[in-house]
Amino acid sequence: MKRRATFQCPLIESTIKHQSTNYTKTETATTSHEVSENANEHKGKSNIDINKIAYYNVVWRKITMKKHKTWEGDGFLVREDSNLTLYNSDFTRLGSCHSRVPQIKEGELLRISGKEISIEKEISAESYEAGTHIDDSLRDVHMPEMKRKFKPPLRPNTMYQTISALPKPRHDPTVLGALVMSRPKTWDPRTHVDVVIDPFLSKHLYSHQREGVSFLYDCLLGMEGKCGYSAILADEMGLGKTLQTITVVWTLLKQSYYANRSSTINNAMVVAPVTLLKNWENEFYNWLGHERIHVYIARCAEDFQEFTSNKTYSIIITGYETVCTYLRNYGCGIDIDLLICDEAHRLKSMSSQTWITLNKLKTRKRLLLTGTPLQNDLSEYFSMVNFIIPGSLGTPNSFKAQYERPILRSRSMNASSRDISLGAARLQRLFEFTSNFTLRRKANILAKHLPPRTDIVLFIKPTHQQENVYGHVLDGFKSSVDQKGYYLKILTRLSKICNSTILLRNEKENFLSTELQDKHVFEQENMLLSSSKLQILAALLKSFQRGCQKAVIVSQYKETLELIELFLSILHVRFCKLLGSTPFSERDLIVHNFNTSSFKEFSVLLLSSKAGGCGLNLTGSTRLIIYEPSWNPAQDLQALSRIYRSGQKRPVCIYTFLSSGMLDERIFIRQNTKQGLSSSFIDSDASQKKNFFTGEDIKTLFSYSKTETCLTYELAFDSDEIDSLTKKKDPLTKIDHTIDSPNTKEKDKEISSWKKASEYMDTNLGKKCPENAFQGWTWQFPNDLSIMNGVEDYIPLEPLPINCLMHKKFE
């Protein structure tokens, strides 16, 4: 009986080697029987060894009386003690039963829960946990090998032949420093030539960028070992994704490994946020020049028609909303050979209109660029992979069953040893497969190419006014907790208080004292009383002025930026701003003026993290202030990469303002633990693990912890150690926190609910606390700010409302 052909997902089901088996003869020789009947047959035998777990590859079907039977699908049979469990190929449980069968043989037919199964072979536990039917590596499903060599229709001696020299490549591959691309498997020197990156581009590439260009070329051309004709370049911000992309595009436009072809593609489309359209155009002309390439920016439907009719242009740059509107109104008539999506985390949901509309393009070669490929969960990454290589990870449900759920279960505080090993195996399997088309490098490789960067986190002591208003809001929350949408409303108010109590001036509830509701509220003295952050900001701007250091101030709230704008005007600081309300036509000019102007012309740029946090080049600045942390750590990572990137020539300092003990700091702690899954999967860093939070975590958000230091430090050290460190007579206490703190004392004492909620599982080290997230940071308690070892160039030498700070240097 022949087995019906089914689609074999290259990751979940791999390749099944079929053997020519006469199933009709097997059914005649081996009568199908119930497992329970076998149990009766072998009952009473004392030498049966069933105390082990065994795994089998099977095919299954529902029990039917049809004459010509077909198998419905593949699956697994797990025998544990006397229990047999049947799973589908996507690990959906199909049924189970109790059995005393001593041995299961290949080709044997069994019946379990109304299903008839045929045993194919026994597999190892490693193969089962990895989620593959066989141990063979994945084969390229897109490039089948030629079965027969091409034969010309005429005999060689009857064809007119001329003796000619072998074809030559566009650039010499033997020159020192030449970057030569991979050759195809069917290489023939008579019909193929080497593809060599143009020297005027390759001479500017760093080593990691040369590797990236080679990787992207192999993926986009479907070279041996690559899956599909697409790729994801997921380098962290600042590593030069734009330059690598331009190099690959230019190479494909001007070269082909076929000697009789002048190019691999005829055109390419770059889809990016509207704030980056002009930046992409400038980058193309900056690296290639106006004489080599012609770029067209499409802002309406007529621009797309102009691009298709005018062969002068080979690159079209457009925004996500623009191209989606065009495709919805005019269909998918535009022919694009290469689709490039910048800031591709916009495609993190398969149900979004952007994903659905762009996926209608009949473009096989697709390149996604993103510095944050995994912001929240694995389903976002699955969505991006499914956009470039449909079906490579199976269906959404099968992906969740086979990978996402086991991986997340393995990071639960209650995970068993089996859950941990299964999750690790699935994670490794997923990483190995996706590494065929995903390239991810971390920003630390920039250290040898860029000047040093210093990160400073300031744990700021709130003013008395902030503490009073904060407590008043929390008291009101406890009495109105059942109101719909009240949680989000309170969180927004608490976040505003961390920045300044003035931001609540227009609230209906009377949170503020009467003296701060009159017309004098915006005087400098009253503004400083409303926020310790403004006090720190004033001191920093004064120190920046001495060294002529330009600064970028980043906030996610428009009201906060407007308040800072007013404060800068009072201090007579010249500034420019880029907010969500800034017209797109003016944004490029603002960035250009800020980068090229002198310190006296513009010393500060106010930047909205949501409007301008992606892709902007602000290397004219050397100081960046993150005024409040974002729930999404990717936003802050995007922001700091605006000034610390290729092209930066001077040392950089990143400041993060946190109101100690308030919502600010709790978000910051959540940030550093939230990146565990991204680090462990995308970066393949086994030391970083996902943190799981319980309901206790949510409760602690609506509280204020007044401490002498900060919550972050208390998570890393026990109270006895804190007292011994903070009560020393030294005016400054410095701690190099580069190793794990001992947990022996914590076992005998009760720890806080927040710390319990912050614990997670590490495969190698067991239960860990968030101190691992802050390894390598140096802690300081500035009772006297006249001495600041390591950060004296970045912190003003005057008394400031700072409980403590931690800093880290990247060089």
Curated annotation (Swiss-Prot):
Segments of skewed composition (Polar residues): 20-33
Main location: cytoplasm
Domain Helicase C-terminal, chain residue ranges per copy: 540-693
Domain Helicase ATP-binding: 222-391
Any coiled-coil regions, as ranges: none
InterPro entries per the UniProt record, alphabetical: Helicase_ATP-bd, Helicase_C-like, P-loop_NTPase, SNF2-like_sf, SNF2/RAD54-like_C, SNF2_N, SNF2_RAD54_helicase_repair
Molecular function terms, GO-annotated: ATP binding; ATP hydrolysis activity; DNA binding; DNA translocase activity; helicase activity
Superkingdom to which the source organism belongs: Eukaryota
Protein localization: Cytoplasm; Nucleus
Gene3D superfamilies with a match to the protein in the record: P-loop containing nucleotide triphosphate hydrolases, SWI2/SNF2 ATPases, N-terminal domain, Tandem AAA-ATPase domain
Disulphide bond pairs: none
SMART domains named among the record's database cross-references: DEXDc (SM00487), HELICc (SM00490)
Enzymatic reactions: ATP + H2O = ADP + phosphate + H(+)
EC annotation from Swiss-Prot or TrEMBL: 3.6.4.12
Biological processes annotated in GO: double-strand break repair via homologous recombination; reciprocal meiotic recombination
Keywords, alphabetical: ATP-binding, Cytoplasm, DNA damage, DNA recombination, DNA repair, DNA-binding, Helicase, Hydrolase, Meiosis, Nucleotide-binding, Nucleus
Residues annotated for ATP binding in this entry: D235, E236, M237, G238, L239, G240, K241, T242
EC category: hydrolase
Cell inner membrane found in the keyword field: no
Recorded GO CC terms: cytosol; nucleus
Stated role: Acts with rhp54 to repair meiotic double strand breaks via homologous recombination. Involved in meiotic DNA recombination.
SUBUNIT field: Interacts with dmc1 and rhp51.
Family: Belongs to the SNF2/RAD54 helicase family.
Alphabetized PANTHER family for the sequence: DNA EXCISION REPAIR PROTEIN ERCC-6-RELATED, SNF2/RAD54 FAMILY MEMBER
The name this protein goes by in its record: Meiotic recombination protein rdh54
The species this protein was found in: Schizosaccharomyces pombe (strain 972 / ATCC 24843) (Fission yeast)
Lineage: Eukaryota, Fungi, Dikarya, Ascomycota, Taphrinomycotina
Gene coding for it: rdh54
